[in-house]
Regions:
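Local sequence-structure signature of Cys/Sec-based thiol-disulfide redox active-site neighborhoods
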Residues: 1-33
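Short glycine-/acidic-enriched loop or helix-start segments at secondary-structure transitions
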Residues: 15-16, 40, 77-79
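Thiol-based oxidoreductase modules, predominantly thioredoxin-like and allied folds used
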Residues: 28-50
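C-terminal cap of thioredoxin/glutaredoxin-like
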Residues: 72-83
Length: 83
């Protein structure tokens, strides 16, 4: 399984997700929004255009960690990735 994780090394939920994905031997590409302005800019474009984020934005959340699956699907649910 290959997955891109979009998050921050400062976010406990992101760290938990990275650990769980490592446990199942997933191939992880980590986009650390706290360390890369280009990754942050790309994430904000995704967040502004993807309907998955409407509830997150309305509640004032950031929406991380986010996961981009091999087929390009985006989910905010680690359970979807681990299936």
């Amino acid at each position: 399984m290959k997955v891109t994780v979009i998050g921050s090394h400062l976010c406990p939920d992101t760290l938990y997700a990275l650990n769980r994905l490592s446990e199942v031997k997933a191939e992880i590409e980590f986009k650390n929004l706290s360390a890369s302005l280009p990754d942050l800019k790309a994430y904000l474009a995704l967040r502004d255009s993807d309907p998955h984020y409407e509830a997150v934005k309305q509640s004032g959340g950031i929406g991380i960690p986010a996961f981009v699956l091999e087929d390009g699907a985006v989910t905010l649910d680690l359970g979807d990735v681990l299936k």
